[in-house]
Design a protein with these regions (language model features):
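Short, strongly hydrophobic alpha-helical membrane anchors
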Residues: 1-21, 157
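Membrane interfacial helix-start motif at the N-side
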Residues: 17, 61-83
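N-terminal signal-anchor transmembrane alpha helix
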Residues: 18-58
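Core segments of transmembrane alpha-helices
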Residues: 34, 76-91
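Alpha-helical transmembrane segments of multipass membrane proteins
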Residues: 34-42, 84, 112, 116, ...
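Short alpha-helical packing/oligomerization segments
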Residues: 91-111
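Interfacial loop-to-transmembrane junctions
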Residues: 115-142
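Juxtamembrane boundary at the C-terminal end of a transmembrane helix
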Residues: 147-158
Length: 158
């Protein structure tokens, strides 16, 4: 059996997954692109701060009023949150979890992370909760939902 069919498409065993989970994979790409964008924003503001900068060190006196602080926190918050989500999405794809559910959860997470990012850049407040907290919470609840529902799916498949 050839892996290239007569329409010049590559046929790889299990490649149906890529079609079935295309929306999920695109959502993951958006999430990872958002995080890369956040890294570039944080680098730009960090290197542009007055008084110079030291690689990887944020001045301890900086707070919410500093875009250097907020861009750094936005990026690190995304890094903290992507690890469990990304792992669960990969497990979902490999275990043939519902493609439509996984796509919906991934896009909810992607959109809430983008809104959270924009609000974190724009809102200068020490108050908690703030409007950005709502979108952090939606992303966190999305993680919890996927953790529980995927766990049930994996247990049922035993």
């Amino acid at each position: 059996m050839s892996i290239i069919n007569n329409t010049y498409q590559i046929n790889i065993p299990g490649s149906y997954m890529f079609e079935e989970y295309q929306s999920t994979l695109l959502g993951l790409w958006v999430i990872l692109t958002t995080i890369l964008f956040q890294a570039m924003v944080a680098i730009r503001f960090h290197r542009g701060q007055k008084g110079g900068y030291k690689v990887g060190i944020i001045k301890p006196e900086l707070g919410q009023s500093s875009i250097v602080f907020r861009s750094h926190r936005t990026f690190h918050n995304s890094l903290e949150n992507i690890i469990p989500f990304f792992g669960m999405v990969v497990l979902g794809v490999l275990s043939e979890y519902s493609a439509s559910k996984l796509a919906l959860v991934t896009w909810i997470y992607a959109i809430t992370r983008i809104i959270h990012m924009v609000l974190y850049y724009k809102i200068v407040t020490e108050k908690n909760p703030s409007p950005r907290s709502l979108f952090w919470a939606i992303g966190f609840i999305t993680n919890i939902y996927l953790l529980v529902d995927l766990g049930i799916h994996l247990i049922i498949k035993l």
